[in-house]
């Protein structure tokens, strides 16, 4: 989820009521059966068979031996759409590691140092939660990349992704507190074309994906508050391929430069150099790919998607260093436009502020809604569809009040100039004592 560079003023919240739409059949949150898996079933037999002809009346009936019940095996493959629990696919509850990369130069010793390895082992549960979330992310996005096509509505895409995430981690988030255990780390970002980030369809949204669209898909998955933040871009017209390649290469460069004692401003310079080496030809015009300079990567803290450190994607004088134990989202945004975004459009993303003040709320609807937010999301970002899903209605006045009182932060869509195209790629990386681990790395990107 994008971190916006600080601005002097926040755009005024603008929201509107809309009716809830029903998701496309087959994308609901009910657990689906994996039709590709062989399941063992119990044999059923008659308790007894009739006496043989000629047998004496009252003779004891012969009984067949009851066969022992066969134990049902754990699934060995994922269903389509994904509904098999990740914990069933990995019954030992040890989840796959991400891409481990050894440190270089003065930090090379860390890979084999006994003290650092001991420190690493102390955080195995923390790492395993992250790997659990990362595996759910990989399997969800694999389905999304395979199935999302022009003609799908953004609402169906969002429901398909979010239903999959909840099913894979085993928490539907409909009971009080359930979504705080595992599930969505933030609302799925589905930002089209010149919109770079923070767009998610509200109820009643009728937008449909078109053949010439460039779609940023930003998915957050958490387990026990440990959030994997990773994004990719889909384009169905090959003319946008260089734009996507620029962002993917720039993100990989940022990951390469990341590590203990790496200076954030210098990482931004490396990212910028790679990004600007790409060009895109559209309608006879050639555009240098520009990094969107007021969007940044960021640290991730438990239940807090935007920690205190920012990773610029252009060179800066920021001398802040990455440190052992940090978790970073390394993300880059490229644009054929101005390379600068502003807030515009209907708001869908919100989050309770970590430093939310204690305010005497006058509106009863605001008090009631804050109670719902505390019990279901805490400080995790949420969207209006998530409130709809919990059965909340007529909450906009209360939500506006919470925003106005500084209790809840709103995140409007972030857009470059109209007619331009933007792309995004992002990974989450753990700065471990011994190695750096790109926790969300997959075969796709």
UniProtKB/Swiss-Prot annotation:
Substrate binds at residues 198, 306. GO terms for cellular component: cytoplasm. It is an enzyme of class 3 (hydrolase). InterPro entries: Creatinase/aminopeptidase-like (IPR036005), Met_Aminopeptidase_Type2 (IPR050247), Pept_M24 (IPR000994), Pept_M24_MAP (IPR001714), Pept_M24A_MAP2 (IPR002468), Pept_M24A_MAP2_BS (IPR018349), WH-like_DNA-bd_sf (IPR036388), WH_DNA-bd_sf (IPR036390). Binds 2 divalent metal cations per subunit. Has a high-affinity and a low affinity metal-binding site. The true nature of the physiological cofactor is under debate. The enzyme is active with cobalt, zinc, manganese or divalent iron ions. Most likely, methionine aminopeptidases function as mononuclear Fe(2+)-metalloproteases under physiological conditions, and the catalytically relevant metal-binding site has been assigned to the histidine-containing high-affinity site. Residues 1-89 are annotated as: Disordered. Its main location: cytoplasm. Residues 60-74 have a biased composition (Basic residues). Its EC number is 3.4.11.18. A divalent metal cation 1 binds at residues 218, 229, 426. Keywords: Aminopeptidase, Cytoplasm, Hydrolase, Metal-binding, Protease. SUPFAM superfamilies: Creatinase/aminopeptidase, Winged helix' DNA-binding domain. GO terms for biological process: proteolysis. It catalyses: Release of N-terminal amino acids, preferentially methionine, from peptides and arylamides. A divalent metal cation 2 binds at residues 229, 298, 331, 426. It is found in: Cytoplasm. It comes from the Eukaryota. GO terms for molecular function: initiator methionyl aminopeptidase activity; metal ion binding; metalloaminopeptidase activity. Pfam families: Peptidase_M24 (PF00557). Its cofactor is Co(2+); Zn(2+); Mn(2+); Fe(2+). HAMAP family: MetAP_2_euk. Belongs to the peptidase M24A family. Methionine aminopeptidase eukaryotic type 2 subfamily. Cotranslationally removes the N-terminal methionine from nascent proteins. The N-terminal methionine is often cleaved when the second residue in the primary sequence is small and uncharged (Met-Ala-, Cys, Gly, Pro, Ser, Thr, or Val). This is Methionine aminopeptidase 2. It comes from Podospora anserina (strain S / ATCC MYA-4624 / DSM 980 / FGSC 10383) (Pleurage anserina).
